[in-house]
Regions:
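A preference for well-ordered globular domain cores
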Residues: 1-146
Length: 146
């Protein structure tokens, strides 16, 4: 009976039909650092998505600011600039309550949403730059959203 360490060895079927045991090379320190950087960048991207989806508050009213709200707000803003929206216009807030917004109130809400998006992306870019500049796995893992 053949035995092998399943954690590190793979069986490879060759062209002649024989099966050979193959142990992949041990990752280098550079490989491990690159993997840690990729993992930490993915964590930052996930945190960015969550942070960018938090409601924004305008005049004490919370509004959804997630990806769908961003699309809806952009579309309606473009339509309003083309004269296709009458004001006051209706918009649902984060509590699912209909708000009647003047053109200025609507513009302020859209501006708040995109200010949040800009802030979140700037933070994400800075953190990812720090990850790329880190020289040890410990330094990489110390870079967090909070």
């Amino acid at each position: 009976m053949n035995t092998f360490d399943e954690a590190t060895t793979r069986l490879i079927d060759s062209t002649d039909g024989d099966v050979y045991a193959h142990t992949p090379p041990t990752p280098t320190a550079a490989d491990e650092l690159a993997a840690a950087k990729a993992a930490q960048a993915a964590i930052i991207s996930a945190a960015r998505t969550v942070a960018g989806s938090q409601p924004v508050t305008v005049n004490k009213i919370p509004y959804d600011a997630g990806p769908q709200s961003q699309k809806n707000a952009s579309g309606k803003m473009v339509a309003s600039m083309a004269g296709q929206v009458t004001f006051p216009t209706q918009w649902r807030d984060a509590n699912n309550k209909t708000q009647s917004l003047s053109q200025i109130q609507f513009a302020n809400m859209v501006t708040a949403i995109y200010a949040q998006v800009e802030e979140v992306y700037e933070k994400s870019f800075a953190l990812k730059d720090a990850i790329e500049a880190a020289e040890t796995i410990e330094d990489v893992q110390a870079i967090n959203w909070s």
